[in-house]
Design a protein with these regions (language model features):
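Glycine/small-residue-rich phosphate/adenosyl-binding loop
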Residues: 1-7
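Phosphate/ribose-phosphate-bearing ligand recognition and processing surfaces
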Residues: 8-108
């Protein structure tokens, strides 16, 4: 188990976005450095800490996917563990948006 403590949302005035991204990045780095091949994440900071779900999902999806691109074959499995259908649909939309943005980067 790798434990991370997410930032408390304070309107975005205290680098919360950067801190949240670091939670995902550092957890993945620690797992990779210790030979852990699977990892599961909740929606960090979106409960009691009040981070907006849509923003948190975009940060999470972007950070995790960029890490995987930069560290090919580092994980066999990465999963989201989401506790309600609203959060699940927000993460699905963030994944779809990320993939569409990535496909726009290809030049032929």
């Amino acid at each position: 188990v790798i434990h991370t403590v997410g930032p408390i949302w304070n309107g975005g005035r205290n680098r919360e976005e950067e801190l949240l991204a670091n939670c995902y990045f550092n957890s993945m780095k620690l797992a990779m450095d210790n030979g852990i091949r699977s990892i599961a994440f909740p929606s960090i900071s979106t409960g009691a800490y009040g981070f907006p779900v849509e923003l948190a999902a975009n940060i999470a999806v972007h950070t995790v996917n960029r890490f995987l691109q930069d560290n090919l074959n580092s994980f066999d499995l990465v999963e989201w563990v989401l506790f309600d259908t609203h959060t699940e649909s927000v993460y699905e939309a963030a994944e779809k948006s990320y993939m569409e943005d990535e496909s726009d980067d290809f030049d032929f």
